[in-house]
Amino acid sequence: MLKDQTGLLMAGSEEAVAHYNRAIGHLLAFQPEVVGQTEAARAADPSCVMAQALRAYLGLMSSEYPDAVNAARFVRGLTSSDAREALHLSAIGQWIAGDWHGASRTLDDLLGRYPRDILALSVGHQLDFFLGEAGNLRGRITRALPHWDPNHHLYGYLLGMQAFGLEECGQYEAAEKAGRAAIAHHADDVWAIHAVGHTYEMRGLFEEGIDFLDSQSASWASSNFLKVHTSWHKAIFALEQQDYGAALAICDETLSSDQSLRTALEMADAGSLLWRLHLDEVDVGARWEPLAEAWASKDPTCWYVFNDLHTILAMVGAGRQAEAEAIVARMEASVLSPERLVSNGLAMASAGLPVAQALTAFGRGDYEQTVSIMAPIRHQLSIFGGSHAQRDVFQRTLLVAARRAGQTAFVQILCQERLEARPNSVWAAAQRRHL
């Protein structure tokens, strides 16, 4: 066996290991070259377990069911006598089977033994994000950091991951510090840039957030997997200040391009922005229809409820209410099925399905029903994944529904909560003025 760039043993030829190491660098920088380097590693040595595992993880991290099914073929029949490689194969198998929590625990176990396994750290971090588990999003990285040499060339990327975990746990100043330290290590660390951007959004520092993202645009606005999502953050900063023109310009330039309407996670960004504009009664023209069509072309399997909810946003926004109701019906059937997927079934039953029902009620103009469904679970939405900033689209929906339903006292509570967290929020102040 040879050693990877962190000093851990792995099976594979020298050429395969070299390509694998380069692939890991691209993975951490969210660069599309990760796919080519992974394929090169697989081609150099098809028996290289870590290369095959990385390829499977790339499919799983898309959050789309067909990619998860396809991921199985990369590890089918693979075994390893090496404990670390065997744990990776186990985690992949659990994830493909729908036990995302089981995969997370297996990766925790793996990192307890091998805290310098950079693939487990990176993949586990994304899995924590998909599961909405903020504590482990922070803890998984924090536990590993003492085992790393700060002079290691990959160390900065760990700080970027730590920054996002700290931010999701509400430690905004510490998150900004860690994120900026990560950027000092690697100017192209778009995950760290995005994490610092989150801290500005959560603190209500919208002008500062725009200035920061503009100052880092040479890194994030190029070809990388976070270009669309970081553009979305910039649009959200504009939206918080009710600068609808700027938000729509970003939507047209980046979020609604043919390229971005191919992957579920980027389509979710587009729909999330358009729905926020919809709540503010901004005319978005024909922008909903291409997005709704893109979602309609996706596999309908209930695999990740976060995506299902954003599909409903697009269908309701496009006036395709019947299709939105059909998605809710599929979700209801999935929850009742004895074969339901473990993790997604839990997320769907506890929060995802009620939110889906609330969104379709909103589409019907039944704002009382929207509030009655969503209000009891408004603090439980993290279970279906995403960040605080992403899930805020549902909190906004609740607030607008309450206002339209004439529930003045509840709206006052929701507005006060928002203004305490984001004192500079023009949007929250405007909602209060509507009363």
Residue ranges and their predicted role:
Residues 19, 37, 52, 87, ...:
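TPR repeat positional signature
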Residues 15, 46-51, 83, 116-120, ...:
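Residue-level recognition of tetratricopeptide repeat
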Residues 236-435:
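Helix-coil-helix junctions within alpha-helical repeat/solenoid scaffolds
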Residues 26, 59, 94, 128-131, ...:
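Residue at a conserved register position within TPR or TPR-like alpha-solenoid repeats
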Residues 36-40, 67-79, 101-111, 134-148, ...:
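Alpha-helical repeat scaffolds
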Residues 17, 22-39, 43-101, 127-139, ...:
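Inter-helical turn/loop elements of alpha-helical hairpins
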Residues 142-241:
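Internal metal/ion-chelating core segments
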Residues 2-18, 75-85, 149-150, 154, ...:
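TPR-adjacent "capping" and linker segments in tetratricopeptide-repeat scaffold/adaptor proteins
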